[in-house]
Amino acid sequence: MFITLKDNDELVSVKKTTGNDEILMASSNGRMVRFNESTVRIMGRSASGVRGINLDGGILVGMEIVEPNEYVLVITENGYGKKTPVDEYRITNRGGKGVKTVNITEKNGSIVSFKTVDDSKDLMIITDSGIIIRLAVDKISTMSRVTQGVKLINLKEDSIVSSTSIVDREEVSDDNINGETIEKESEELSFFFTSSYIISLSVH
């Protein structure tokens, strides 16, 4: 066992870090924190970790390592999305609620995914009804933190976005990019993220 989970908790993400990276964590209710990993002390392998974000009734939708000149790409359950320069997210206190990353309304719904990206990548959006759509990241609107985004995928009635993935542009043939729909049914690790907690382990 490499982490102790609390009741009703689950492991969400694992990332390799340098020891001085900046971390982004986002909740489904539209908030995001950015903090330096140096604020998380090194712990034993089976520790539960310390709080990374106050979810305030939401759930953790992911975490990313901050890279210069990248965008934060946010996708909501009703198929809306946007990208925002990472510099718009100021450093906040680890364990706090963070800053608003999207204006959540009945129209766009809760956040289901966020990624840090650059314009050389493609975005795959997957719905709970088995639809996949691929979009070039450079075609997605760049907007401020507090906007609701624009519609990226038309959903069937009662369908929602279930997950997303960032892929290299050459991984899939040109027949499946820019909005075409497809229908179908040992490195060293140092950071572990559960529903709202974070643990740092020495990799040596």
Region annotations inferred by a language model:
Residues M1-F191, L201-H204:
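C-terminal interaction appendages of subunits in large macromolecular complexes
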Residues F193-S195:
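Generic detector of N-terminal low-structure segments
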Residues Y197-I199:
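Short, low-complexity segments with poor structural confidence in diverse proteins
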